[in-house]
């Protein structure tokens, strides 16, 4: 740690710190003179006569940059006011790179620097005695983070957006942005700490995840691993529990879309983090020839993470082998009128363990790689963008015990769209598709009636259009239409999905929202497994859903934002026919079944933004998820949790942030059978308390964050299911207790 601080200190020493104290606003004084209106050539005033030159004061050029203290990020729009001994004021404003210039008479000047969200800074400076560029560092206000969380439905699409800072500091998430999903309304965690989520009563495999519009086949590393994307590679995340935009498709539940951080264009930035479980690094820098010019402007961001806990665990428990790593690269470049962006990412997991002494090992190996090139430019009065992504997946996993399958899958994914903005209507239209080749090698007889274990080709194509129509100052309507075509093997199916979103402002702080539509998806397993997708179209047909949601929200109560949403969704899904898994053959035609389903509920979100000293949210979900079991019988789905409550709280005290999360959910149903009866029995209610404390130390050119987090500090046991004695029929709980501590340190410059 000392060596990291020493190296960062050397980097910081290369710049000149303004280093002056802080001052309050000063009122009064003579008329301000903009810097551009002050005459001068750096030595004397440019007057037209010799006498005027003799009487004019000598002039000097004061220039420099305004940066964020602790991160070296540029502060655009900072207002600088220089007041001379005569009371004359000269003003300037920093540009997008934080740079500024002002011409001043020689002599002492009081320089006042202010920017929204930062503490004011005052210092004294003589433009003539020291011509070196001035480096000014502003400290962000403790109660005003630079990155604010927004949980507001925009005018055209209802959703929930989390920005960078909240993604990595939510208690219970272990600093992992994607784990914040489990604290949001409408989300049921199947069995903590496994990151498997059922959204609004659907199967976990019915929700899609996208990074910069590139579909990610899995969210998390195996076992208790983090997400497959470096946490500081994210910029924002949007959550659509239902009614998602028409530009996305092929999932019948909701989607999660994440955006990556744009590469730095103002200089080298780097961060390194070390945790109990792994270590990672992220480096971002501009192109060497692009700084300060439009042509070639852009940069590169790279991230890599490696887990060393697998090696430690393997040494402690010889029957377990665990290892994972991941990488991400984003490169942006301006080429003429085109903005190019290249995204490359990949992940690898290996897990092997013995179920019991003397038994065969269960082995998992999951790897995926994605490379996508996106190009965009202004075209007419709108913007055109095109993207081409190539992917390679490899999976070795026993879908059920005794039936391992190894699959290699390759894909080419094109996408193109056009957005047009006018005074009253914003519309967009586009095309997308996917060509996918599966080459499985299964350890089962190939006389299977399912094509999941067979070589196959999938060709998917979609077209969409939507328009945000502003009907006056209060009402926005967003109709949309999407067409999807699915060809798997020799079978083709298609679906037309109308969609509608609406938002009505009752006043400046209260609104009504509505969303709904039809969605489709190829058959899928209940839980996503890379390579085990796009199969069985001939046997099961398309999965479909009709969704509808209505909400009301307000910001009229102090600094709170409150929103309540009711929803109803009807599905046709591919489900496991027998939840007790008496039939263990995943290749048989009746392992999966086409089944009608229904879910409905109420979601409540009460939030105080992170700009407040006390911040956080409370989310509550009252839900019911049902499946048609045949013969007119409705039963609860495997993921049905009636009540889900999350309370997330953070409190800033100086450089410390204290946080906690309380989670409670009622149990899922489990089917219990004997010779004369079968019934659903609920698992026990699960609750947990998560605690987090973090300290941020801000130096001139870098920051250091040290944090301690304890997840499930209550030590509550997770009941995974029920084991039933085949003779007596008595049940016992299959449970475990896990407490996850995390101690970490992160340095960023």
Residue ranges and their predicted role:
Residues 251, 265-266, 282, 286-366, ...:
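Periplasmic-side early beta-strands and strand-to-turn transitions of outer-membrane beta-barrels
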Residues 38-40, 47, 95-97, 117-119, ...:
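Periplasmic N-terminal accessory/gating domains of Gram-negative outer-membrane beta-barrel systems
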